[in-house]
Design a protein with these regions (language model features):
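Structural motif
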Residues: 12, 51-54, 152
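Enrichment for repetitive, rod-forming helical segments
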Residues: 12-13, 81, 180
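Polar/charged alpha-helical tracts
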Residues: 2-5, 106, 110, 114-118, ...
Length: 183
């Protein structure tokens, strides 16, 4: 029953994120791929031209939420993460593309967290890094607890999140997010 609540929470957050995120009408072709590389013990995932990431260990693609462009992954310990990439100028709050780097990341956090706080969730910034253009924050409530890293590089946005990770401490979740972003 507990896993059903977690799965429902994942679905709810994905739907809510996708309803908040408006990527505009102009279609952009992307190339999506990746694979597990046993010799390096990493799982690579990319959405070209928007971003790529190397995940430590073996991760299986689990679910994909197309309207949020969010790929979920699950590892052998049942830890669930999500990854989304996109252009910074396609977000509703940045249509003119004037927000860049850390200013964009802060506006993205404000926009996203405000939306969820209005729905009864709680949000807290855990760490900010203006020189590397990222914010790590936590969203929790209604039996749901997620850690996010929002980052921006050269007009490209990454949204990494750790959803179900009961076996990881808060410090491990934060370090995981930082490691995959800063590599």
């Amino acid at each position: 029953m507990n896993i059903i609540k977690h799965l429902f929470g994942l679905l709810l957050i994905s739907v809510l994120v996708s309803s908040c995120m408006s990527l505009g009408n102009a279609a952009q072709s992307t190339i999506v791929g990746g694979e597990y590389k046993a010799d390096k013990n990493i799982t690579e995932y990319f959405v070209l031209p928007y971003g790529e990431v190397s995940l430590p260990g073996k991760w299986e693609k689990w679910q994909y939420v197309s309207n949020a462009r969010q790929q979920f992954f699950k590892n052998e310990d049942s830890v669930i993460i999500a990854i989304a990439f996109g252009p910074a100028n396609k977000y509703e709050f940045n249509r003119n593309g004037l927000l860049k780097e850390y200013d964009f990341v802060k506006a993205y956090y404000d926009w996203e967290s405000d939306y969820f706080v209005k729905l009864g969730y709680e949000a807290k910034i855990i760490e900010t890094d203006q020189s590397n253009n990222y914010i790590i924050w936590r969203l929790w409530g209604q039996k749901y607890d997620t850690y996010f890293l929002f980052g921006e590089r050269n007009g490209r946005v990454c949204n990494y999140s750790v959803h179900i990770a009961d076996k990881w401490s808060e410090a491990e979740k934060i370090q995981f997010l930082k490691n995959i972003y800063l590599k």
